């Protein structure tokens, strides 16, 4: 299992050596950021520079090529102005899921208002609804369905924040806050009954689309 604190220190040292004062933010997202990582979980790192060019990306790729667990590294690389100009409905999850190690997301986070969060919920539910129908008719994939259920968790995080002003990162803690109808979506772990699981997710997303529409 990865010692993520040790690994992130090595990553930060390497980024400082590579980009120096151009670094605006370094952070960690995903299962490692939430303390829910398993063996083989991706390392979702965030690197925000003053700007990003093709040369920067080549430098970045070269810098991380020799790191341990290179095959697990993914995440988000961006220039700071692009991030500030990003759609705020999308920025909601980004900001609240990121554990910042260098720099701060506070300025960007403070620009996100209640309607941006509503749009995050609505757009997420719309994408799940479409993905569920497409998968039922065309792909018929349990793996895709599993991914859609994972997306539903992020929508539920946004919905809970919209209703309470509290962001809950960990799945188990989120499950404990949900009413039975929503909790059944979070608790699904097996996808052997494809039709029933698809039906449940489709009905859940349809209800949310209607509730959160402008």
What positions do the PLM features span?
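Catalytic core of pol beta-like nucleotidyltransferases
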Residues: 1-17, 21, 33-39, 50-214
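Short, glycine- and small/hydrophobic-rich beta-strand elements in well-ordered beta-sheets
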Residues: 21-29
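N-terminal loops that bind phosphate or other acidic moieties
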Residues: 44
């Amino acid at each position: 299992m990865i010692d993520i604190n040790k690994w992130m220190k090595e990553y930060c040292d390497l980024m400082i050596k590579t980009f120096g004062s151009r670094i605006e933010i370094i952070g960690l997202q995903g299962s490692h950021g939430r303390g829910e990582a398993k063996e083989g979980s991706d390392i979702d790192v965030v690197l925000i520079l003053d700007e990003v060019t093709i040369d920067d990306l080549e430098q970045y790729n070269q810098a991380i090529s020799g790191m341990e667990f290179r095959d697990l590294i993914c995440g988000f690389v961006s220039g700071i102005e692009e991030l500030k100009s990003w759609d705020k409905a999308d920025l909601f999850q980004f900001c609240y899921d990121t554990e910042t190690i260098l720099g701060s997301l506070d300025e960007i986070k403070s620009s996100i208002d209640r309607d941006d969060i509503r749009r995050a919920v609505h757009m997420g539910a719309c994408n799940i609804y479409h993905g569920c129908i497409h998968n039922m008719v065309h792909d018929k994939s349990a793996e895709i369905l599993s991914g859609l259920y994972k997306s539903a968790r992020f929508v539920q995080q946004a919905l809970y924040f919209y209703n309470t002003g509290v962001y809950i990162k960990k799945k188990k803690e989120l499950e404990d806050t949900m009413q039975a109808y929503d909790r059944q979506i979070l608790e699904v772990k097996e996808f052997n009954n494809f039709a029933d699981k698809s039906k449940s997710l489709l009905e859940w997303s349809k209800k949310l689309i209607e509730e959160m529409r402008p």
